[in-house]
Swiss-Prot record:
Forms part of the ribosomal stalk, playing a central role in the interaction of the ribosome with GTP-bound translation factors. GO terms for biological process: translation. GO terms for molecular function: large ribosomal subunit rRNA binding; structural constituent of ribosome. It comes from Erythrobacter litoralis (strain HTCC2594). This is Large ribosomal subunit protein uL10. Part of the ribosomal stalk of the 50S ribosomal subunit. The N-terminus interacts with L11 and the large rRNA to form the base of the stalk. The C-terminus forms an elongated spine to which L12 dimers bind in a sequential fashion forming a multimeric L10(L12)X complex.
Amino acid sequence: MDRSQKADAVAELNSVFNEAGVVVVTRNLGLTVAASTELRGKMREAGASYKVAKNRLAKLALKDTDYEGIGEMLTGPIALGYSADPVAAAKAAVDFAKSNDRLEIVGGSMGGQMLDEAGVKALASMPSLDELRGTIVGLINAPATKIAQVVTAPANKLARVFGAYGASEAA
C-alpha cells in the first residue's frame, strides 16, 4: 500500500467515524473467511457495516472525531463494526459472537461515550431506533383509538339492540 492509498484509506475511515452513530471494535483472531463473510452479511442485514482496518491507519482516522478514545483498543487483529443506528452494529456483533467464539468484542463507542465489552452487550439488548419509533407511534395512537371506540360504542350497541329486536319480531 503506497502513501496515496494510505491517505485515501484514512480519509475513508475518517468519514465513516464522522457519520457513525456507534463503532464496535472486535478482535477477529482465527475467524475464517467464511465466518467473516457471514458476519458482514449479518451486519448488512442489520443496517451496519463491518471493516477490517490497519490499526495505525484507523488511529490516524480517529483524530478529531467523537471516537478518538477507542484508539487504545486498536491492538492486534481488529475489525470495526459501525452504523448510523446506535444499536444495529452492536446487536449484529453480539449475536454473531454468541454463535462464534472466534469473534471477541473488545469494546466500542457511541458518540463520545466509551463502551467496554459489557457496555456493547448492554447496548445490543436495547431496541433499535425503528422499534422505538414504532412503540412511540403505538403509544400516541392508542388514546385516539380508545376515544374512537368509546364514541362508536353506543351506536354499535343500539344497532345490535335494533337488530335483535327485528330478528325476534320476524321469528
